[in-house]
Design a protein with these regions (language model features):
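C-terminal ends and interior cores of transmembrane alpha-helices
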Residues: 75-94, 294-308
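Hydrophobic core of transmembrane alpha-helices in multi-pass small-molecule transporters
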Residues: 12, 77-80, 93-117, 121, ...
């Protein structure tokens, strides 16, 4: 089979496992009475991202081939997703936050490192095949977004948004990928024998770069916009679904198929990537970042004023704007790091921004928002949230 097709299938399954629950889990937690705990379920993704990717990276470098480690991470992630789903199914109205959260956390702890591992496997395979990673990897990565969208649609159409079956779908995708990794090209381990400090392992030395005013400002805005992204992941679905309690909107498409409506964001994200080269060349990095920040304002403004009925056009436009908000800032942000620093330092810089963005947006975005909207079905605090 063609190498690009094989890697595209890997990316499809990689993000399908995430897309099965990432945007709909909030609605499920609301449904079982854990609405006030939504923030913690999303925050833990950021918390484990502080150390798990680094630890798995060390293992992949020194002891276990990356493609094999990718598979075993998905094996454990999938198994614990199954256990979480089984626990939820058997306990029903007696689900305890501590138990479900622990099972979910273990699953996520094994999943988050696979985002980097899958990239390493793809880059390694393309390099060995003599291909241009800059040119050939982006089209392969697009299939990850396609997989994410497909699972969103499947979970929606199958009626799994308000129940634990979305965890089962995620687990199935992970187990399939576990077996699939045995067919992927091998990645060599390369222990150079050099002893590294904790600062080096976790890339913390790169934070010295933020002593520069320019990077400090970028760092702050990266965290703040990261908070916005995580609020979208955790609360967009519960927000749209909450309109079902209003008779006027109870039977609208958006209320009954929130995941499909939200998937327009990912579709827009895929399309907007194509616009970035033109905007970067025409308007420059700073202006592109300003456009992204303004887009986030419109994203939440349209969300706050829209509804699934006559105002559904605001929801749709909000989803389209999301592509600009997400892509323009992320890619221009990486360009900032690469333009000011040498290659080795720029990698550490982008990695530090990514790690900090993951834990900070996960913790602050969803925990703060869940504190503000503990029970949106019984109050009108959604406007304040957005």
């Amino acid at each position: 089979m063609n190498l690009k097709i094989r890697l595209a299938a890997m990316n499809f399954l990689e993000f399908a496992a995430w897309g099965a629950y990432l945007t709909s889990m909030g609605t499920y937690l609301m449904n079982i009475g854990l609405g006030s705990e939504i923030g913690w379920f999303y925050a833990v993704q950021g918390i484990v991202s502080i150390f798990m990717p680094a630890l798995m990276g060390i293992i992949a470098d020194r002891w276990i081939q990356a493609q094999r480690l990718l598979g075993f991470c998905h094996l454990f992630s999938g198994l614990f997703m199954f256990v979480a789903a089984y626990y939820a199914l058997t306990q029903q109205a007696h689900i305890q936050f501590g138990i479900l959260f622990t099972l979910y956390t273990i699953s996520v702890a094994f999943y988050m490192p696979t985002l980097a591992l899958s990239n390493s496997v793809a880059y390694n395979a393309l390099t060995k095949a003599g291909m241009d990673t800059v040119k050939d990897f982006p089209p392969i990565r697009v299939f990850g977004t396609i997989g994410f969208i497909c699972m969103m649609w499947i979970v929606d159409i199958m009626g799994f948004q308000p129940n634990q079956n979305q965890f089962i779908v995620s687990g199935i995708c992970s187990i399939i990928l576990f077996f699939y990794t045995f067919t992927l090209p091998k990645c060599d381990t390369h222990d150079d024998g050099e002893k590294k400090s904790v600062m080096d392992i976790f890339g913390l030395r790169a934070f010295a770069l933020f002593r520069k005013k320019k990077m400090a400002i970028f760092f702050i805005f990266s965290m703040l916009l990261g908070v916005s992204l995580q609020i979208t992941n955790g609360f967009a679905n519960p927000f749209i679904t909450s309109f079902k309690d209003i008779p006027e909107y109870a039977n609208t498409f958006g209320v009954n198929h929130a995941n499909i409506l939200i998937s327009l964001s990912q579709i827009s994200e895929t399309c907007c990537i194509l616009l970035i080269p033109f905007f970067m060349k025409r308007y420059g990095i700073k202006n592109v970042m300003l456009i992204a920040m303004l887009a986030w304002v419109f994203r939440f403004g349209l969300f706050g004023f829209g509804n699934p009925g006559t105002g559904v056009w605001m929801f749709v436009l909000s989803m389209i704007v999301y592509g600009v908000a997400f892509d323009f800032f992320n890619i221009s942000g990486f360009a900032v790091c690469r333009s000011d620093y040498k290659s080795g330092t720029s990698f550490k810089c982008t990695r530090s921004v990514y790690v900090d963005d993951q834990w900070y947006r996960g913790y602050s975005g969803d925990v703060i928002c869940s504190g503000h909207c503990e029970c949106p079905y019984s109050n009108d605090k959604w406007d304040g949230c957005y």
